[in-house]
């Protein structure tokens, strides 16, 4: 039986030392375990949007049994390409509880990404180049830190799937590959559409390169690659019914070079600006180092061409695509990681060992700083969340969160901390997203009005740097529908901005930052009817 030629460029023997420490299974497992450490001791992972997702998960899990949540929200299951973590929460939430389940799932995402990067590097080169270790910190890239957990999970799984695609070709097991990847393509599409599209792009390139290595002409290589990738195509049929009813306004802000530049330099954005920028600069320097001398020899063609096409996709993508914000930003860590993985090793044993040690120390340093940063975020969360002790079940909470300007590198990551009132108290909070076609939750509480019922009505920045759809504090306090809410929760708000209002009764203060007010009402309110035992009745 004829064996298929591998898509792989083996490295010269003298380039790699035998039994190199970074190629052992123990090293790979250590790197995967290391990726979990920053999230190990943070019960609420400090990712900007995550708490908002957790509020949605609470509605998802309990809307059928909670009179509070069913009064404020609607949740209808549908097949959309953005459900990776949602489905895992549906599986694990009833077993572990919502918060432990989310903690476990989110902690696994960087581990999956690191595993995918190492597997792909080994499969594409035959052995793990020492430079590949420099890609590992991108498991904590800005999209993950922002809380795009469905996207991050799906991209990690995509890397593993692509490595498996290459492995099956190398081993000549092409008979079963279409059947396996027919299923894989649907799973990836459901996890996140971007991952499915990226897998298709990389698999097509791999098939073209493989045919060219077999001596086939370009045209034949191209159409054979199309045929090989057809099992990945069926999820495209789901795009029409999924997005068919979306508003045309769901895609906009094309070729915004200002933001694209910000995304490039923010690839490792976390807390300490100088450290994060220097780290990003180092990764870009390593990724582009292959251009200095015979780039056609320094870059492995499958990943090199793949990274180039992802750069083109990044340039062409709008900032908001089909109601999904920051569409272009999400690709930056992936395209940078793939370009780093594309580098073929050069030099002798001593240089390879030196690069591997330097890369490992860099990853350890990034993990250490991230761990300390996450601990600081967690302590700040704990201080503000003390207010929840004074909020009853099913309350209606108007959140106003003090938020730094977008230009500030450091962010408190509290934009959606108020959703913990939904998670722990089944409360209505004005911080959920309205994104038809992108998620399944709907706000069904008309008394809150069109603006003060959803994100970003909770985000309060300085007037000179706020977005046009974000509130001005004084105006929000004056005009939000007071009869629709029971509490005003001013998260991380400095004392000099606390209002003095006859209708606001302070019930908790966080020393210098944060205050919770109970609203004094003068008429019956439209919330759930309370029984004598405090339980809500229908």
Where are these regions (language model features)?
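Short hydrophobic/aromatic helix or loop-helix immediately within or flanking a transmembrane segment
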Residues: 55-62, 73-98
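Short periplasmic/luminal acceptor-recognition loop of GT-C membrane glycosyltransferases, typified by
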Residues: 377, 387-472, 477-493
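Aromatic/acidic, Gly/Pro-rich catalytic loop(s) in extracytoplasmic/lumenal soluble domains
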Residues: 461-538
């Amino acid at each position: 039986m004829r064996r298929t030629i591998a898509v792989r460029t083996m490295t010269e023997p003298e380039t790699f030392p035998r039994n190199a420490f970074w190629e052992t299974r123990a090293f790979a497992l250590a790197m995967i375990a290391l990726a979990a450490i920053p999230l190990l001791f943070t019960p609420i992972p400090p990712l900007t949007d995550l708490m908002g997702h957790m509020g949605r998960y609470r509605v998802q899990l309990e809307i059928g049994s909670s009179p509070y949540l069913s009064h404020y929200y609607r949740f209808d299951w549908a097949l959309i390409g953005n459900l990776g973590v949602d489905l895992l929460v549906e599986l694990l939430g009833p077993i572990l509880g919502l918060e432990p389940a989310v903690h476990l799932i989110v902690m696994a995402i960087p581990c999956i990404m690191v595993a995918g990067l190492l597997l792909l590097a080994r499969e594409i080169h035959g052995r793990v180049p020492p430079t590949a270790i420099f890609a590992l910190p991108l498991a904590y890239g800005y999209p993950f830190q922002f809380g795009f957990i469905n996207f991050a999970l799906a991209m990690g799984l995509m890397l593993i799937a692509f490595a498996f695609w290459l492995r099956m070709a190398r081993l000549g097991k092409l008979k079963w590959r279409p059947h396996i990847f027919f299923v894989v393509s649907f799973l990836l599409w459901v996890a996140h559409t971007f991952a499915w599209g990226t897998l298709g792009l990389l698999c097509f390139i791999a098939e073209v390169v493989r045919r060219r290595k077999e001596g086939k002409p370009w045209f034949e290589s191209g159409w054979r690659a199309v045929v090989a990738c057809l099992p990945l195509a069926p999820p495209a049929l789901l795009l029409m019914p999924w997005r068919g009813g979306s508003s045309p306004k769901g895609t906009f802000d094309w070729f915004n070079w200002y933001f694209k530049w910000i995304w490039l330099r923010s690839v490792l954005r976390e807390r300490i600006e100088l450290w994060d920028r220097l780290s990003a600069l180092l990764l870009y320097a390593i990724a582009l180092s292959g251009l200095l001398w015979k780039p056609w020899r320094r870059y492995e063609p499958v990943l090199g061409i793949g990274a180039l096409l992802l750069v083109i996709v990044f340039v062409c993508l709008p900032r908001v695509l089909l109601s999904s914000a920051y569409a272009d930003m999400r690709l930056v860590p992936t395209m940078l990681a793939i370009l780093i993985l594309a580098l073929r090793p050069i030099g002798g044993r001593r240089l390879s060992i030196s690069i591997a040690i330097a890369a490992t120390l860099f990853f350890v340093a990034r993990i250490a700083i991230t761990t300390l940063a996450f601990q600081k975020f967690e302590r700040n969360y704990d201080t503000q969340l003390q207010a929840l002790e004074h909020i009853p079940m099913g309350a209606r909470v108007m959140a106003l969160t003090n938020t730094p300007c977008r230009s500030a590198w450091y962010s408190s990551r509290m934009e959606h901390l108020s959703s913990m009132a939904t998670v722990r108290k089944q409360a209505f909070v004005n911080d959920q997203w309205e994104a038809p076609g992108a998620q399944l939750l709907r706000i069904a509480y008309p008394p809150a009005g069109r603006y003060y019922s959803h994100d970003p009505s909770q985000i309060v920045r300085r007037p000179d740097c706020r977005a046009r759809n974000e509130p001005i504090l004084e105006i929000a306090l004056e005009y939000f529908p007071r009869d629709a809410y029971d509490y005003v929760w001013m998260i991380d708000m400095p004392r000099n901005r606390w209002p003095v209002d006859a209708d606001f009764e302070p019930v908790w203060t966080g020393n210098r930052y944060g205050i919770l007010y109970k609203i004094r009402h003068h008429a019956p309110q439209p919330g759930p009817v309370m029984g004598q035992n405090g339980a809500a009745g229908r």
